[in-house]
């Protein structure tokens, strides 16, 4: 095509749109990095194994159920959750968390997960979400493999019983340090909230 002022203006207009898109993407990346850094900093200051009653804010979650509760079933559920979040442009600096029924925990059944979730700081613009209610939660940070959570759950239940704390219907496992943050599974940190 010929060089002309009109052609150059069209070219500049297209370039400006591309730059705006890149700036928007970079802004989202920067926000994600800041939030993820904040999660890591807070986790580094949190003592593992210390049980606390914590006032928690209302939190938004996008959730999915696993068809089967074996490793493959959970891998598929997490994949569905990621696809759903991608489809609805839901981004979060939080790692995937898992929810169990408190009744199962009280029966010492520590691997009967019902749901995996993506925790969010804000209500998503589209799609289905659930609200984790604000209120007092019995919390503890567990360091180590998720298959070793049973002992930490036992301690939580004993503490609740000794303090006569009424537990809610669900237990939330917020993954704070996962494979993105630590190299070894033994260094993983999961925050339990009952």
Give the residues covered by each predicted segment.
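A solvent-exposed interaction/effector surface
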Residues: 5-194
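Short amphipathic recognition helices of helix-turn-helix/homeodomain-type DNA-binding modules
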Residues: 1-3
